[in-house]
């Protein structure tokens, strides 16, 4: 018998201006729409495009809103902060990253679980434009998280439709990238 544990911290490490805010927000909203209490935090040193940015979601069945030390799941999408991001993962936690290129040995930790998703490789045949591939990688990791965490896919696709309502040309490719 499996049981769901709705008490964890997930942090998204991204590059500011990469379109990650939309995907990360959809992740939190999807959990909330499923009736799971969440608290979100943006952590960024600057609003300058290209600099690091983090988005943290605390999932707490008891409704705790404050931050707590450590990260249970790290979605590491920023090469510049990769080492720091891995260091913040609690023992027994998870690292989700794009394994289209092999993970360097200096980033390996024996006390965490690595989940490599070949995001860039998957997007290459789907989207010819490099800028599109860069933007859709965020939606692709959202789809991977939905599968890993048993988030209802209909909730995620509904979030995409809501997010891009009135911009119908964006809905289909975003759902395809999931």
Language model region names:
Residues 1-178:
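Active-site cofactor/cluster-binding pocket
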